[in-house]
């Protein structure tokens, strides 16, 4: 008894007097399933074998009911219809009718009209709008099957109705196919699909299969009056079991409504969403943050990203060609953030930019902007890498700086002075000329401006070599390049020079080189890899060391250094306006030349190691533009030979 009580509070009476109270079990209609334990007690009089049967409602207690006198069928009724009385319907549905089905029927008068509620049965009906058919549908659930009835023509879904009877699919389909009046529905919610048959035929099938009471109130003529209304939910008349059942069905009805596009259920959610959206919008102060975050938040991030992404291009261009120090910081920050979490870059860039501001950002930007803009974003990321690797060797920083330094152009002027270049400028006056021939570092601050147009194309080639030389130059720290005398000539190719300068930035040792590198950084940006530039350094070292003012101290004449592989790009950079065209050709050669001092010896005077230059005399043309072509050639020849 106790166990039974535990199953259902409603059933305690059953528990106490399971047999006598069998009817009481009817009270919990919804709990009929759980009530089966009491049934088992009821069944005890009959046969414990039925204890298991309770799960199968049909067999519940027909035998039990017979022996106990209290038809366990009531338990069946509970399952289907919580009626304390023996329910013939239950027995009919139950497979055990063979045992005591007749007996159970006898006590209970079977309602063939479907208008009378079985004892203890409470109507549970839901309605949804069947948009496709333009009609309301009343739904009654029996044995877990939702049987629908149309409001307009009162046709009933025969497929679902026969499913309640537990009929096999083949038999069910055969019966429905033989129906003269039928409406086949193949599209729509699952509970509305099937073969719809007239009300009368459905009632006949229900009576024949003895499921009429289970389907109550499906066949009630005024079924609309029995509709469940949320306001009725609290009525005391509705038993807790009924409430539970109703609650359980609510989801079903809601689903049905969704499928049928029920107006009430679906609308509220949409309304809520709209409200939440509108409220945030309307009252962004308090709700906007919260309400918007769910929906708009995605949008907002999108906006932020949009700003970020657009900004980098603008910043990049500004950095390259523009000297917006603020924008350069922002740009590096924004770009870096997008690609790499550029904050480190932005920070490093800011620092390095300050140092490398001297780079020829102001002048470089024009040409650099063109290349840098296209490459800028990618290179910025690459540069960011150099920054990290660079800090050890500063070249990276300078490269980064070069990029950001573009933005800092205004700073670059004084920064350059801060950098070794300013002092170099005096020293490099001669070297500057030579370097002009190289077209490398000499571009310095002022050079940057001119180089933009022609060198850009060259920068790409020069970057690799330039970077290589740059690293050497960086070691040289003091760059004869600083001499800005060449700035004018170099300036046009400053971007190319920048690559060379970039090489020096790799060296980072020399502040000047870094600024130039910064200028070249644009080129580097194009190359996007400081490393490629560093590759050049070995060859450029040989030459640059000689040609650099530092190189001279090393015993390498700055002239030779300039002729060095780095020099070739430099010449292209300096390229002096005519040299630019040559520089481009030279670049092709440069790829080869950096490794070939021989070419330099022949005609690479001015630091250009280019077969073409030697053969075509392009170098000569470019050098003609050079302020000190003769010196450069002499230096180049001497330095290269000395190196060898």
Swiss-Prot record:
Disruption phenotype: Produces thick white aerial hyphae but impairs sporulation. Affects the expression of genes involved in central carbon metabolism including glycolysis, the TCA cycle, and amino acid synthesis. Decreases pathogenicity after inoculation of detached wheat leaves. Keywords: Conidiation, DNA-binding, Nucleus, Sporulation, Transcription, Transcription regulation, Virulence. Residues 456-465 have a biased composition (Basic and acidic residues). SMART domains: KilA-N (SM01252). GO terms for cellular component: nucleus. The lineage of its organism: Eukaryota, Fungi, Dikarya, Ascomycota, Pezizomycotina. Residues 38-47, 253-269, 334-357, 371-383, 395-404, 525-544, 635-644 have a biased composition (Polar residues). Residues 18-33, 87-104, 315-328, 509-524 have a biased composition (Low complexity). The keyword Lipid biosynthesis does not apply. This is Cell pattern formation-associated protein StuA. Transcription factor that regulates asexual reproduction. Binds the StuA-response elements (StRE) with the consensus sequence 5'-(A/T)CGCG(T/A)N(A/C)-3' at the promoters of target genes. Required for pathogenicity and positively regulates the synthesis of the mycotoxin alternariol. Acts as a positive regulator of Tox3 but is not required for the expression of ToxA. Also acts as a central regulator of carbon metabolism including glycolysis, the TCA cycle, and amino acid synthesis. Residues 584-612 are annotated as: Nuclear localization domain. It is found in: Nucleus.
């Amino acid at each position: 008894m106790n166990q039974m009580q535990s199953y259902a509070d409603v059933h305690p009476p059953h528990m106490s007097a399971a047999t006598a109270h069998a009817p009481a079990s009817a009270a919990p209609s919804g709990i009929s399933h759980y009530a089966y334990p009491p049934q088992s007690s009821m069944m005890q009089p009959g046969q414990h074998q039925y204890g298991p049967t309770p799960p199968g409602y049909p067999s519940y207690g027909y035998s039990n009911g017979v022996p106990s006198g209290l038809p366990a069928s009531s338990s069946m009724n509970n399952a289907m219809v919580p009626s304390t009385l023996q329910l013939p319907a239950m027995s009919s549905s139950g497979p055990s009718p063979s045992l005591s089905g007749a007996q159970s029927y006898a006590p209970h008068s079977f309602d063939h009209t479907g208008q009378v509620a079985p004892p203890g049965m409470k109507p549970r009906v839901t309605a949804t709008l069947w948009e496709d058919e333009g009609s309301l549908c009343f739904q009654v659930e029996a044995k877990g099957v939702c049987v629908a009835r149309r409001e307009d023509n009162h046709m009933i879904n025969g497929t679902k109705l026969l499913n309640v009877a537990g009929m096999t699919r083949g038999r069910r389909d055969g019966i429905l196919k033989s129906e003269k009046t039928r409406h086949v529905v193949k599209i729509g919610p699952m509970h509305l699909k099937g073969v719809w048959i007239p009300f009368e035929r459905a009632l006949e099938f229900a009576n024949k299969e003895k499921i009429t009471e289970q389907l109550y109130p499906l066949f009630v003529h005024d079924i609309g009056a029995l509709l469940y209304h949320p306001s009725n939910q609290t009525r005391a008349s509705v038993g807790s079991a009924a409430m539970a059942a109703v609650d359980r069905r609510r989801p079903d009805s809601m689903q049905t409504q969704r499928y049928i596009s029920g107006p009430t259920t679906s609308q509220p959610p949409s309304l809520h969403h709209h409200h939440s959206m509108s409220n945030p919008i309307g009252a962004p102060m308090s709700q906007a943050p919260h309400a918007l975050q769910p929906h708009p938040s995605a949008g907002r991030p999108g906006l932020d990203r949009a700003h970020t992404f657009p900004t980098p291009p603008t910043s990049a261009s500004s950095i390259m060609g523009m000297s917006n120090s603020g924008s350069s910081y922002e740009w590096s920050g924004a770009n870096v953030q997008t690609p790499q979490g550029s904050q480190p870059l932005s920070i490093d860039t800011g620092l390095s930019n300050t140092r490398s501001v001297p780079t020829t950002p102001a002048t470089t930007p024009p040409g650099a902007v063109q290349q840098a803009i296209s490459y800028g974003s990618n290179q910025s990321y690459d540069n960011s890498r150099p920054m990290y690797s660079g800090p050890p060797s500063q070249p990276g920083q300078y490269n980064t700086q070069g990029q950001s330094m573009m933005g800092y152009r205004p700073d670059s002027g004084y920064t350059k002075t801060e950098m070794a270049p300013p002092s170099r400028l005096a020293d490099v006056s001669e070297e500057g000329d030579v370097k002009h021939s190289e077209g490398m570092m000499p571009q310095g601050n002022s050079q940057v401006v001119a180089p933009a147009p022609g060198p850009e194309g060259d920068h790409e080639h020069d970057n690799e070599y330039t970077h290589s030389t740059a690293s050497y130059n960086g070691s040289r720290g003091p760059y004869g390049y600083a001499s800005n005398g060449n700035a004018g000539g170099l300036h046009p190719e400053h971007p190319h020079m920048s690559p060379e300068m970039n090489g020096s930035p790799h060296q980072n040792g020399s502040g000047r080189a870094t600024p130039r590198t910064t200028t070249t950084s644009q080129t580097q940006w194009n190359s996007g890899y400081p490393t490629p530039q560093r590759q050049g350094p070995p060859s450029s070292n040989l030459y640059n060391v000689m040609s650099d003012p530092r190189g001279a101290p090393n015993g390498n004449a700055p002239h030779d250094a300039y002729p060095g592989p780095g020099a070739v790009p430099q010449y292209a950079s300096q390229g002096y306006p005519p040299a630019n065209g040559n520089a481009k050709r030279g670049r092709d050669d440069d790829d080869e030349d950096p490794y070939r001092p021989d070419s330099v010896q022949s005609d690479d005077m001015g630091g250009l190691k280019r077969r073409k230059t030697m053969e075509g005399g392009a170098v000569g043309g470019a050098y003609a533009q050079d302020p000190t072509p003769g010196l450069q050639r002499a230096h180049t020849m001497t330095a290269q030979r000395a190196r060898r």
